[in-house]
Amino acid sequence: MDKECKSNLESLLQGVAKEFNLKIHSLDILTNQNPIIVKIIICKTNKDDITLDDCSRFNNPAISVIENSNLLNCSYVLEISSQGVSDELTSERDFKTFKGFPVNVELNQKNSQIKFLNGLLYEKSKDYLAINIKGKIKKIPFNEVLKVSLCTFKD
């Protein structure tokens, strides 16, 4: 499938998404599969979380648009999903949800040799981030934290 065809299909699907206060985050057409797979990742225009009902409501109108466009002249499987969870923790909700999970903290300490810390997310306040490193709580001033990401521990 060429780029123009994919672009046309994405434009048509954006119109349908708009009717449901959604937008197309990405559209992938996997032509190396049989039948081909049309993967649509949607997100809400107001930044709320996508529910299974949102995906379900979008499904039939998306099928109609694809079928009526005649851009795909073969059988296909349609997959509609949300973006999922980002590894990077940014919102207060993220920090509450993932308390106790392993995190990688990227530091902004210019004069220090330590650029990353790994531990369990313990607490976040407006002034500091606390992580549990091998049973000891380390408080890091938030102005020294560049990024906090979920990770996996390998002991």
Curated annotation (Swiss-Prot):
Species in which this protein is naturally found: Prochlorococcus marinus subsp. pastoris (strain CCMP1986 / NIES-2087 / MED4)
Which InterPro entries does the record cross-reference, listed alphabetically? Ribosome_maturation_RimP, RimP_C_sf, RimP_N, RimP_N_sf
Name of this protein? Ribosome maturation factor RimP
Q: What is its main location?
A: cytoplasm
- The protein's superkingdom reads Bacteria
Give the UniProt record's GO annotations in the biological process aspect.
Answer: ribosomal small subunit assembly; translation
The entry's localization annotation reads:
Cytoplasm
Gene Ontology CC terms, in alphabetical order: cytosol
